[in-house]
Structures are given as C-alpha cells and as structure tokens.
A protein has these predicted regions:
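Active-site-proximal substrate-binding core of FAD-dependent oxidoreductases
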Residues: 268, 532-546
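A glycine-rich dinucleotide-binding beta-alpha-beta segment and adjacent secondary-structure elements
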Residues: 194-209, 382-388, 445-512
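Rossmann-like flavin
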Residues: 98-214
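N-terminal glycine-rich phosphate/pyrophosphate-binding loop and immediately adjacent elements
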Residues: 3-148
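Flavin-binding catalytic cores
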Residues: 125, 337-338, 376, 425-460
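Mid-domain catalytic core of redox enzymes
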Residues: 264-398
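A conserved FAD-binding loop/helix module that cradles the flavin
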Residues: 509-530
Length: 546
C-alpha cells in the first residue's frame, strides 16, 4: 500500500514542471504532488546572492518578450505574484577590437520599426541595413504567427504539418528552403555582405545553443537572430522570482510540494505507471499520471528501466549529444559599470545595453574554430566572450541602490566530465583572470579594483546543481543540433511527451521544441494531458490560436 497518493505525481520541480503543475491545479482541478531532490523548486529559474544585495542568476538570465506569452494570458496572477520582466534600450552590441567601433541592435520597445538599428547597420553596409529591415518585416508580419504555432503546440508527427512547415510553404514568408540545410555561418554569408554583420550573430547563436558551423541549423539561427536580438528582457528581482510566483499559484490551487525528496524510480505494473519510489523506499501512488522532468537518459535507465523499452529507443537515447552547450556564467558585482571605448562610436553601447559581444573583424570564422576545438575535447584557444547586463534602475532589485545593475560574462567551455574536481577549482580562478584581462581591452576601468566579488558558474557547477544537467553540465540538458530540435527532440519516439509506458510522460528542456526557460515544454505537456485526461483547454475557451 502506498504511503501517499495523488492524482498527478511529478518527478522534479524544474521550470517546466511548475508550468504544467499550474495548469493541472488551476484548470484540471487535480491533486498534484511535486517531488524535488533539491532544497527548492525552479531548476534553471535560479538565483543566488554572492555579495550582499547583488542577485546572480545561475542559469537562465536573458529572456525575450515572447517568453511565457500564453501562460501569462491564461494565468495572469502568475505575473502579479512576481513573474515580472523589464527591458533596456539596447539588445545586442558587437564590439570590434581593431578600432573600438560597434554594431548596435536596439530593443523593439525603444525601436519598434528597427529603423534606428538599420541606421547603425548602414554605418557598415547600406545593403545589410535593408536586409535587416526586410527580415524584421517578415518576422513581424509573417514568421511570428507560424513560429509561435510551432513553439506553443506539442511536436507533430512527420506526416502532419507543424508551424515551421507552414512557414516554409507560405510564399509570403520569403524563406529560402536552402536555409534549412545551411549552417548558420553559411546563411549569414548568403544574407549579408559586410564582415560586421556576418560576425554579429555568430556568438549569440552559441548562447542560444546553436552550433555556428553545423549544417541544418541555419534557419533556426536566423529565427533566433531576429526574434531575440531586439527583444531581450530580464526578470525583476532575479529569475528565481518565476519559481516563487509559480509555487504560489500551485499551492493556492491545492498542489503540494516536497523538496529534498529524491525519486529512485517509477513503479511499473503490466505496462502502466502506477507510482514512484523515493530513494528512502517511500512509495507514492499516482492515480492518473506521472510526469518526469529528468533528462532522457535518466528517464530510460533510472525511472523506467531499459527492460521496459525497445532496443531502438534505448540506443537513440544513449546516442544523444550533449557536449556543445556547456557554459561558464560569471556574475560580476562591480563598483561602477564598465566604460567602453566604443561609447565614442555610439554612446548607447554602454549603460542600457543587454548583450555585448567582443569580436575581431579579421577572424570571421572564429566560432568555427572554437566549436572544432571543443568538439575535440580541447580548451578554446581564445576567449569568445559576451557580457549580459541587467538592471540600470533601482526598481529592478538586482543590485544595491546606487549601483542598480549586474553583469554576467559568458564563455563556452568543455563538458564537466573532461576535467577533474581539482582542475575545475583551478579553472574558476584562472578564467576570472582571463576575463578581466580581455575586458580591460574594451573597457579600461575593468580592473580588479572595480570588482567587489563574482559568482563563478561552470559546467562542473551546473552538472552538480541538478542531476538532469549531467553528466556534461549542459544548460540545455541535451544539445540543439539539427537532429535534436523540434519533433526530433529528444528523439521522435518521445517528442510528444508520451512514453511507451501508459500514464507516464516526459517533460523538460530536452523536449520539443528547443531548450530555454520559456516554459514551452511545460505548456505543451499540459496540452497532451488535457487530451488524454479530458481536462479544460483555456486557450480554446479564449479563442486563442495556440
């Protein structure tokens, strides 16, 4: 006999589990129990305080204005409880080392037509400025509706059109089918004539989880370029506020949360998931369904057991790639903001800029080299650094009053398993020194005298933060290569959230459509459950397209 019983049992309380649980409790009216191994909920919605008053996001930090769009539509109190975001004036800025000039992409809230951005691009190429305005027009008037249909619906079978298929089939989209086959670097060379624009989005693509040199990622990279670069936002008070707000919605609607309750496995009887067994031996009954937010390997080998699955599913999961999206995020607590030499070229590249990329014109294929080195298991021979700055206003609650901002530096590195614990500890310090050395070349005031403290997040930290990010310490759980996107993510047999075990569902960043803190998987998982369990569908009641 089970020790406890719920309608729905959730294994893991990460961001997507919280989204699904909000819907299950509010619209499904179901009794939900969430069992989380860590001391708190949220997964990648996490924030720490390394120095008094400074908030450091340890995973998801830069969001976009289209994140959580249907969730806020259906559950408006979530925003009221703390899921609030803000934007700065500038999105991406590329700093060029040769002459300390810069290419500036303004945010859509400040530059809704992108004419100001086009003016900046025209300083390097009038033709590329026109191309940017063409892309922006396509994004606003054609692409957006199709891409959102792809994002906010479960993975479709291969014999049924999804949103991306419809986009490519619409002559008004202007999309070239060849872009689907190209690498991002090939696509940028196809679209832009200037070195500056070809370089501008290579490094941000890496931040999205897309390999610049890999075939099949071109159109996905282009979508992220246009959808994200002018649309960055950040969570007021730190990303973990999203988890606090979601937990409040869940508890108000009858859900229950159990932290420090690691799950050992799913209990399976006659091909059906009946409950879970905790590591301490406690058994929890699931009357209707079990939803896991573990990685695909954990789902197959730990939660289910490969004896319950086909050899094909086990083999495909074992062959998933996770070497690429392994990252360092160092949040820097500073006395004053960096003063960039490029502010003489455009003053807006300093205060108010979100993402700054440090680049060299002479090295157009710099990201290709970085990717090859890391794929061979070698440390990158050169820093390809970007900074992510948030705040600038005391109401953003991200730093002590009078400072009012925080800045994170990001560098991709090797997977956790390639270095020892001792090597990672040494790397934490040496990487900080390398960052300051490079940063000074663009902002001379960025010396150690300006540093109060820093929070070093490495792939080693991420792999040990929560098991589903392991063994690589991959922020996307698995990579976003062409064979692991959309209806193929993580594998076609699991992409719809349903598993071969009745009443058992997979969820999380490793599922369709792409990794991130946007909650798409959690929303789409509820859509599948609403079909299987005959639950309310608030999007239909509101007449929404998705």
């Amino acid at each position: 006999m089970a020790d406890k019983s719920f309608d729905i049992v959730m294994v893991g309380g990460g961001s997507n589990s919280l989204v699904t649980a909000m819907y299950l409790t509010k619209f499904g009216g179901l009794d939900v129990g969430i069992f989380e191994a860590r001391h708190e909920l949220g997964g990648g919605w996490c924030t720490e305080e390394p120095v008094g008053g400074f908030m450091a996001n340890c995973c998801s930090t830069a969001m976009c204005d289209w994140y959580w769009e249907p969730i806020k539509r259906d559950i408006p109190e979530w925003e009221e409880y703390g899921a609030r975001v803000a934007q700065s004036r500038v999105g991406n800025v590329v700093l060029f080392s040769e002459d300390q000039s810069c290419l500036t992409i303004y945010q859509s809230n400040f530059d809704p037509t992108q004419e100001l951005t086009a003016r900046e691009i025209a300083r390097f190429s009038k033709k590329d400025a026109d191309t940017w305005l063409w892309l922006w027009d396509k994004y606003k008037n054609v692409w957006s509706k199709y891409v959102k249909e792809w994002w906010w619906n479960p993975a479709q079978p291969f014999d049924k059109q999804d949103g991306l298929d419809k986009l490519l089939a619409d002559p008004a989209s202007g999309a070239d089918p060849l872009w689907l086959r190209m690498s991002p670097m090939q696509l940028y060379k196809d679209l832009f004539e200037s070195i500056e624009m070809r370089i501008a989005f290579q490094r941000p693509n890496q931040s999205y989880g897309i390999n610049t040199s890999e075939g099949g990622g071109g159109f996905h990279a282009l979508m992220n370029t246009v959808f994200a670069s002018p649309n960055w936002s950040y969570v007021i008070g730190g990303t973990h506020q999203l988890a606090h707000a979601a937990q409040r919605v869940i508890i108000e609607n009858g859900g229950k949360v159990f932290t420090k309750h690691p799950v050992k496995n799913v209990i399976i009887e006659n091909g059906k998931a009946k409950g879970i067994r905790l590591e301490d031996g406690t058994e929890i009954e699931a009357r209707k369904a079990i939803i896991t937010e573990v990685n695909p390997s954990q789902l197959v080998h730990n939660m289910i057991g490969k004896e319950h699955l086909s050899e094909k599913i086990v083999r495909r999961v074992d062959n998933l790639e996770s070497w690429f999206i392994n990252i360092t995020w160092y949040t820097w607590c500073l006395k004053e903001r960096p003063h960039y030499l490029a502010e003489k070229f455009n003053p807006d590249c300093g205060e108010g800029a979100t993402c700054l990329i440090m680049a060299d014109r002479e090295d157009e294929d710099y990201m290709v080299k970085d990717n090859i080195e890391r794929q061979l298991g070698r440390r990158p021979s050169k820093l390809n650094l970007t900074t992510v700055a948030h705040g600038w206003h005391k109401d953003d609650l991200l730093a002590p009053e009078g400072i009012d901002f925080n800045i994170l530096t990001e560098q991709f590195f090797l997977p956790d398993y390639l270095l020892t614990d001792k090597e990672w500890k040494e790397f934490e310090k040496t990487h900080a020194e390398e960052v300051i050395e490079l940063w000074q070349k663009y902002a001379p005031n960025m010396t150690w005298d300006n540093v109060i403290g820093f929070n070093p997040i490495t792939p080693h930290y991420t792999a040990n933060f929560a098991k589903n990010f392991g063994p690589a310490g991959n922020w996307g759980v698995i990579d976003m290569c062409a064979s692991q996107m959309g209806r193929c993510r993580p594998i076609p047999e699991l992409a719809s959230h349903r598993t071969p075990i009745k009443n058992l569902y997979g969820n999380g960043a490793a599922w369709h459509p792409m990794p991130g803190a946007h909650g798409m998987q959690g929303y789409n998982c509820y859509k599948i459950l609403s079909e299987d369990l005959n639950l309310k569908k608030p999007w239909k009641e509101k007449g929404a397209p998705w």
